[in-house]
């Protein structure tokens, strides 16, 4: 129907899992933001995100069962103000939350439903966030609020299975094409052509409504003729009504001209002239301010739509191309703006304007205006861009730093096409620093054990460069060497330097930070630039402090402990086991199928391993035989769809469904140790209540609902006010060995260096000893 549509998203998915790479946390949020942006292009939807910056309060803190928990963690007033602001900016006629507030739904989705329903009326109340008026945002009352429904109880049925001959797909298929962009979440399905419907129920309305409606806009002024009838009785209403009726005829003419592109362009530009004239009439008319604001907004939206339609109909291809997207403060670079005319209509008075941030300088290197551009011709304007010496480092959630406006005249009216570079243009640190390891354990039982740190440095300055690399360490600690000079022959060259950090002999338990520093004259870098590059989202960056977090606590690790680790690709616990002194071998398919498993004291299966290591299914009998002969097998959480079957365990274990009901999301929830004398809680590390403190995001995921009586139930734990689970941590003797199944979220806690989680995991892999 050509309705101007917006998708407002709360957070950026930082707390999820990554199905295409190793990025987690903020880096994953950056990927998912770019995926949202690309998905929005597919469906021609304008994207808005309430989370505004890295580590914003509206953060994906992981799975939540309730809207109350979500709003408490986000700050209800923070998220509500931003949603009300969006509604007042966009002034929608119809509002639809994507999810219902029901127990089977993620708490983040439920929270947005709750505040969206509330905002339907509050956005129109001038006493709600009155400060918006100071920024030119007037209260706004949407006409209707719908919520998702089903075929048993609905108001509107949307035929998403209808085939669109222009797009060559059904709307359901187009939607899935958009969902396929969310590759980090594994989204997207293939649907055949054929009837399909989405259902929605009218929840609130300010206009007369019926039990069944033909579409969302029944009873709402939908066409320019509808608007003309609404304003006809107002002061200067007859003049306005004539202008609006003219626009209705224009719109009909545009549609009738399709697919004759040149004719479409002519009608678009006729309508553009009429829209711009109507805007002037609205400003001069004796209207009440609410009506003036409404008409102005609608006409501005139409003007923007016509700009897009003009470029499409004229086959205008506009691009902005920096010689490099990787800049540093003080650098000068060339940026080119091009306009190609692929249509038969000559473009006149073509202007290529480069837009840069305040404080930047963009100097034309030649012509930027061209009298006429004919069919199959390209014009180019080159600019010398100077980045100020105090330019802030790249922030991935801000609008693009460089854009271009291509303006041109056709059929007597001027249109503007705004373009952005295909990849991010980023101000990066002159020297990007990364530390390996990125997090480290300091065992206070061995305080003088040195920590080896490798600093990798990438030169982002144009040309050759030199820098002295050093580490800032806590007071009383030492580092060798104190500094190391590096010389780079060209931009993009990467070199590494090794340091040895020695903690103070009196180091106490706690968190310490080591920072990498690159100094080159007056320039100093203390940041790293993580390059994030995938085919479906292009290139972007995560700039963050170049820091190594060190967690100091006491940890006993048996000598000579040998562990085989079967990775699913979704966790990196093996790296941290190595770091604390465990001899870890990553097991290949061949190792699992035919290798000597008896050489390992313990074999650990990473999260969801049965779903992503098919050899585990065919070799499961070998694993159980390994246990029976005296081995120690540790299995981390699985979902039913990970090929999990109860009989994979030596005694049956059934995973609870629906999955949403079988997890503990409060990382601070009380844990009771049901078998406090079990070796897992005593050997080699004594586990106390303190070891359950400072966990992050969750306690457990996808807990078992049934298990054999042979298992020892190690803990009881549940979210506040809910039943406790006793199948979260199960262990059993099998033959001469031990089998342990745990749905505690070790994969989150151990990389976060949670002391209790690391101490318990070491105990778990030490059971044979």
Describe the function of each predicted region.
Residues 291-330, 420-444:
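Low-complexity, acidic Ser/Thr/Pro/Gly-rich terminal tails and inter-domain linkers that flank the onset
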Residues 65-317:
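Metal-dependent de-N-acetylase/amidase catalytic core
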């Amino acid at each position: 129907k050509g309705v101007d549509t917006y998708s407002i998203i709360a957070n950026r998915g930082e707390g999820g899992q990554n199905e295409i790479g190793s990025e987690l946390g903020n880096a994953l949020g950056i990927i998912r933001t770019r995926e949202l942006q690309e998905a929005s292009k597919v469906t021609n939807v304008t994207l808005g995100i309430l989370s505004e910056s890295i580590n914003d309060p509206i953060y994906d803190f992981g799975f939540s069962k309730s809207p109350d928990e979500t709003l408490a963690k986000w700050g209800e007033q923070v998220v509500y103000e931003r949603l009300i602001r969006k509604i007042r900016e966009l002034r929608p006629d119809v509002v639809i939350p994507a999810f219902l507030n029901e127990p089977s739904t993620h708490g983040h989705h439920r929270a947005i439903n709750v505040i969206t329903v509330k905002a339907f009326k509050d956005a129109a109340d001038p006493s709600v966030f009155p400060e918006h008026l100071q920024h030119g945002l007037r209260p706004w009352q949407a006409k209707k609020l719908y919520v998702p429904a089903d075929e048993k109880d609905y108001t509107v049925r949307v035929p998403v299975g209808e085939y669109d001959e222009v797009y060559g797909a059904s709307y359901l298929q187009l939607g899935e094409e958009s969902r396929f962009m969310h590759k980090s979440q594994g989204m997207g399905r293939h649907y055949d052509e054929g009837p399909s419907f989405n259902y929605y129920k009218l929840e609130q309305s300010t206009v007369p409504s019926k039990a069944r409606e033909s579409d969302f806009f029944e009873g709402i002024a939908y066409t320019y003729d509808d608007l003309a009838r609404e304003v006809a009785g107002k002061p200067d209403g007859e003049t306005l009504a004539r202008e609006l009726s003219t626009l209705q005829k224009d719109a009909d003419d545009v549609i009738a001209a399709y697919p004759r592109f040149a004719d479409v362009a002519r009608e678009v530009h006729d309508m553009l002239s009429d829209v711009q004239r109507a805007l002037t009439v609205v400003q001069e008319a004796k209207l009440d301010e609410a009506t003036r604001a409404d008409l102005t907004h609608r006409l501005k939206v139409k003007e923007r739509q016509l700009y897009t339609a003009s470029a499409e109909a004229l086959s205008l291809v506009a691009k902005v191309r920096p010689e490099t997207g990787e800049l540093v403060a003080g650098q000068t670079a060339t940026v080119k703006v091009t306009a190609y005319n692929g249509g038969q209509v000559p473009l006149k008075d073509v202007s290529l304007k480069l837009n840069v941030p305040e404080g930047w300088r963009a100097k034309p290197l030649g012509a930027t205006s061209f009298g006429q551009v004919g069919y199959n011709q390209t014009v180019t304007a080159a600019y010398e861009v100077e980045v100020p010496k105090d330019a802030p480092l790249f922030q991935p959630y801000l609008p693009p730093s460089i854009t271009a406006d291509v303006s041109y005249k056709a059929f007597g009216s001027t249109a503007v096409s705004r373009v952005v570079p295909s990849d991010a243009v980023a101000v990066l640190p002159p020297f990007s620093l990364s530390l390996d390891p990125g997090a480290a354990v300091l065992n206070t039982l061995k305080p003088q054990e040195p920590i080896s740190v490798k600093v990798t440095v990438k030169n982002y300055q144009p040309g050759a460069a030199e820098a002295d690399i050093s580490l800032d360490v806590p007071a009383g600690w030492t580092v060798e060497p104190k500094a190391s000079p590096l010389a780079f022959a060209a931009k993009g060259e990467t070199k590494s330097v090794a340091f040895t950090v020695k903690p103070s002999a009196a180091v106490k338990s706690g968190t310490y930070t080591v920072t990498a520093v690159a100094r080159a004259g007056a320039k100093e870098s203390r940041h790293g630039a993580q390059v994030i590059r995938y085919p479906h989202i292009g290139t972007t960056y995560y700039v963050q402090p170049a820091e190594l977090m060190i967690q100091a606590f006491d940890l006993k690790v048996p000598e000579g402990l040998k562990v085989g680790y079967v990775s699913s690709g979704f966790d990196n616990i093996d790296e941290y086991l190595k770091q604390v002194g465990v001899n870890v071998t990553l097991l290949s398919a061949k190792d699992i199928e035919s290798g000597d498993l008896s050489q390992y004291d313990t074999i650990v299966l990473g999260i969801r391993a049965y779903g992503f290591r098919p050899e585990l299914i065919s070799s499961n009998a070998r694993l159980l035989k390994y246990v029976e002969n005296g081995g120690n097998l540790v299995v981390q959480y699985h979902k039913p769809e990970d090929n999990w079957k109860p009989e994979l365990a030596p005694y049956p274990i059934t995973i609870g469904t629906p999955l949403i009901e079988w997890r503990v999301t409060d990382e601070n929830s009380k844990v009771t140790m049901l078998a406090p004398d079990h070796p897992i809680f005593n050997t080699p590390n004594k586990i106390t209540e303190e070891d359950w403190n400072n966990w992050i995001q969750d306690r457990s995921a996808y807990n078992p609902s049934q298990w054999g009586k042979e298992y020892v139930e190690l803990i009881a734990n549940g979210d506040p006010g809910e039943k406790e689970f006793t199948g979260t941590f199960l262990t059993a003797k099998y033959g001469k060995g031990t089998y342990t199944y745990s749905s505690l979220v070790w994969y989150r806690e151990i990389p976060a260096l949670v002391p209790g989680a690391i101490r318990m995991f070491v105990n778990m892999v030490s059971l044979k000893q």
